[in-house]
Regions:
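Edge beta-strands of extracellular beta-sandwich domains
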Residues: 26-38
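Intrinsically disordered, low-complexity Pro/Gly/Ser/Thr-rich segments with frequent PxxP/GP/PP motifs
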Residues: 1-14
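Short, aromatic- and glycine-rich surface loops/edge beta-strands on solvent-exposed regions
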Residues: 12-25
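Residues that act as N-cap/strand-start positions at coil-to-secondary-structure junctions
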Residues: 26, 53, 163-165
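Catalytic beta-strand/loop cores that center a nucleophilic Ser/Cys/Thr
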Residues: 14, 76-77, 94-193, 211-228
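Short, charged low-complexity linker/loop segments at the C-terminal edge of domains
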Residues: 38-42, 207-215
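Short alpha-beta junction capping motif
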Residues: 44-94, 172-177, 181, 202
């Protein structure tokens, strides 16, 4: 049928592109995402990336610093959402008829204009750039952490349980600022370009004045999420 070649080197910013093929009166199109090659992501002096609020992270928060808590896949306790099977695809038929067959969720909702997602092109719903994040994550029952905090990225729960679930949210701990991620940003990152771009987007956000959590929670509440 032929081939298509396109040089991506001139694309300097993250972008969602559309390839459309037209033959006579028939057309089809496909979305794909291009992310510039990033240098290895390392913790800046201003932000600590961790999977648990240990003494170093707690000291950072108490001194007014910034911490990105990224939960490792499989470490979220069941009572906080660890028993919910998140899926990129939605529930098949319904979980009552399938005896709780996975997945237990119905995609995500987010504000595409939220500054945390600025260098991560997205619609308000999940698309294929979210596949990696959702397959390396757990949905957090945010109402058990804070009654006031709102998700940056919301996971839609099964309509039978309808728990408020978050993939990303932010809170204030003492003088410090904490971004909590149900997405695992630790494992196999060299093989996950979409995850690297999303992490870069979050770190850029945390380094900006837009990152200003208002709702206060206790350190013990956050650490209770994790099954160590």
């Amino acid at each position: 049928l032929g081939s298509i070649e396109f040089n991506l080197k001139d694309i300097e910013k993250p972008a969602q592109l559309t390839l459309e093929v037209l033959i006579d009166n028939y057309a089809n199109n496909w979305n794909f995402w291009v992310y510039p090659t990033e240098k290895e992501i390392v913790n800046s002096n201003d932000i600590l990336l961790t999977d648990y609020l240990d003494k170093t992270a707690i000291k950072r928060l108490n001194n007014g610093g910034k911490v990105l808590l990224s939960l490792k896949k499989g470490t979220l306790k069941d009572e906080y959402g660890g028993n919910l099977a998140i899926g990129f695809s939605s529930i098949f038929w319904n979980t009552s008829w399938t005896n709780g067959q996975a997945p237990h969720t119905l995609g995500i909702l987010c504000n595409p204009k939220h500054p945390a997602l600025a260098p991560f092109p997205t619609e308000y719903h999940s698309n294929y750039q979210w596949w990696d994040a959702m397959t390396h994550s757990a949905p957090i029952r945010i109402n058990k952490v804070s009654k006031e905090a709102q998700p940056i990225v919301r996971v839609i729960d099964d309509w039978f349980s309808n728990h408020p679930l978050a993939l990303l949210f932010e809170v204030k701990i003492g003088k410090g600022k904490l971004l909590v991620s149900g997405i695992d940003f630790h494992r196999d990152m060299q093989m996950r370009p979409a995850a690297r771009q999303l992490l870069s987007s979050l770190l850029n956000y945390m380094q900006s004045s837009d990152f200003s959590p208002r709702h206060i929670v206790k350190i013990e509440t956050i650490n209770d999420l994790i099954d160590k």
